[in-house]
């Protein structure tokens, strides 16, 4: 559970790097996705797949707004520890 909260916090920190007009959309999108997967199977593979997806999607959004993906280094460390 702690890792899930750390990943969520990492995603929300990246949302703050986005342009001001797009932050509310991505903050809501991230929250909805974390809430939707609250009841997911707690096996390591299920969670690892979700962490991989969260990281990849975060990179995609950063690239979309021309933000250097090195900003997601901390999230990568959390997701793949």
Swiss-Prot record:
The lineage of its organism: Eukaryota, Viridiplantae, Streptophyta, Embryophyta, Tracheophyta. PANTHER family: OS01G0342800 PROTEIN (PTHR36758:SF1). One of its GO terms (cellular component) is cytosol. It comes from the Eukaryota. It comes from Arabidopsis thaliana (Mouse-ear cress). This is LYR motif-containing protein At3g19508. Belongs to the complex I LYR family. LYRM9 subfamily. InterPro entries: Complex1_LYR_LYRM9.
